């Protein structure tokens, strides 16, 4: 089934939320999604249209945070993307940050939605840098220490070094 690109999940959703199992997409977090037998998308409330196994209708607040956090991971259900190891999120349209996961989230400072800083390397044999969007630091490899892109100072909190 061709993927549908005209419906979205959640109030803050921008990119469409497609169910990878069926090719259907949800119109919202609460509305019905697709028939369990034929996998056809439905907009009514008929039999088999309960959205029970449609993954895109389930909240996904912890999209890209934690130890292996890289550049932001967008959550189509909440309209947020992770910014740090503490699950801070930012809205995809305004780039405002929120400490919650969706509607009514409180805005704080957002790092991962800002352009990543490039151009610094540390160590004797520094090659291409590993940029950490959470701290703004980058390092030459996972063994060397990190440096700030502007001051070239060591950055002990650069997660990409760990």
UniProtKB/Swiss-Prot annotation:
Pfam families found in the cross-reference section: Metallothio_Cad
Positions of the propeptide removed during maturation: 1-2
Alphabetical list of InterPro entries matching this protein: Metalthion_7
GO molecular function annotation: cadmium ion binding
Keywords: Cadmium, Metal-binding, Metal-thiolate cluster
Keyword Membrane: no
Keyword field contains Nuclease: no
Taxonomy, superkingdom: Eukaryota
Induction of the gene: By cadmium, and to a lesser extent by mercury, copper, heat, hydrogen peroxide and IL-6.
Cited function: The metallothioneins are involved in the cellular sequestration of toxic metal ions.
Family classification: Belongs to the metallothionein superfamily. Type 7 family.
Name of the protein described by the UniProt record: Cadmium metallothionein
Species assigned in the record: Tetrahymena thermophila
Gene field: MTT1
